[in-house]
From Swiss-Prot:
<keyword id="KW-0235">DNA replication</keyword>
<feature type="domain" description="SSB 1">
    <location>
        <begin position="5"/>
        <end position="108"/>
    </location>
</feature>
<keyword id="KW-0233">DNA recombination</keyword>
<dbReference type="GO" id="GO:0006260">
    <property type="term" value="P:DNA replication"/>
</dbReference>
<dbReference type="GO" id="GO:0003697">
    <property type="term" value="F:single-stranded DNA binding"/>
</dbReference>
<keyword id="KW-0227">DNA damage</keyword>
<dbReference type="Pfam" id="PF00436">
    <property type="entry name" value="SSB"/>
</dbReference>
<keyword id="KW-0238">DNA-binding</keyword>
<keyword id="KW-0677">Repeat</keyword>
<dbReference type="GO" id="GO:0009295">
    <property type="term" value="C:nucleoid"/>
</dbReference>
<protein>
    <recommendedName>
        <fullName>Single-stranded DNA-binding protein</fullName>
    </recommendedName>
</protein>
<feature type="short sequence motif" description="Important for interaction with partner proteins">
    <location>
        <begin position="258"/>
        <end position="263"/>
    </location>
</feature>
<comment type="function">
    <text>Plays an important role in DNA replication, recombination and repair. Binds to ssDNA and to an array of partner proteins to recruit them to their sites of action during DNA metabolism.</text>
</comment>
<dbReference type="InterPro" id="IPR012340">
    <property type="entry name" value="NA-bd_OB-fold"/>
</dbReference>
<feature type="compositionally biased region" description="Acidic residues">
    <location>
        <begin position="247"/>
        <end position="263"/>
    </location>
</feature>
<dbReference type="InterPro" id="IPR011344">
    <property type="entry name" value="ssDNA-bd"/>
</dbReference>
<dbReference type="GO" id="GO:0006310">
    <property type="term" value="P:DNA recombination"/>
</dbReference>
Amino acid sequence: MARGLNRVFLIGALATRPDMRYTPAGLAILDLTLAGQDLLLSDNGGEREVSWYHRVRLLGRQAEMWGDLLDQGQLVFVEGRLEYRQWEREGERRSELQIRADFLDPLDDRGKERAEDSRGQPRLRAALNQVFLMGNLTRDPELRYTPQGTAVARLGLAVNERRQGAEERTHFVEVQAWRDLAEWAAELRKGDGLFVIGRLVNDSWTSSSGERRFQTRVEALRLERPTRGPAQAGGSRSREVQTGGVDIDEGLEDFPPEEELPF
């Protein structure tokens, strides 16, 4: 089993004023909406900007410390991890991949350029949006092709986490790869270890029942297959791309309602 690695690094602008509240047990929860624009290279060598909005959750004493100090538009660095949660609602199982902040620091905004969305909310241009994961595939990769012939692969990654004083937890992350990277990933199999470097994106769609659904996933920019022991002495296989995805709307302007989010 691959060693678990689960780190998220974000630099963006606070799209709204942070929301502070407490659980019935008195635990402080600070929810932040961080917004930015990634600069990606397209197939023809040109550059394009892709907007993103990520909800970040900070708990406990740090939440209380920053709750009254942060405001809309402020630039913030977040180091944290992805946390997988499950719950049931009206007899249906739901899940969420949440960004849990471990550290947060406000940043000097001198020389930084912002953009505004249609609601006047700020986004940081040339932001930071990076994810580093290591885990094992939960299923064989699913490879398909778009009508334009672009390869896209979906992978399920199980990341084990053991924190001091806590039981081991497993976080399930959906990973998507494009083009040559997708075709390389299609050769992997369930149970294989995989190291992923990518960017965090959000999807939304309408279910067959008419409900709006959301999913947070990782768009892979680089994949490495770790090898352990003489059985895999052929060396690790790796693949890297300069950019991922196609021109789709990845900057979500809304999020799941609070009643959909467990804590």
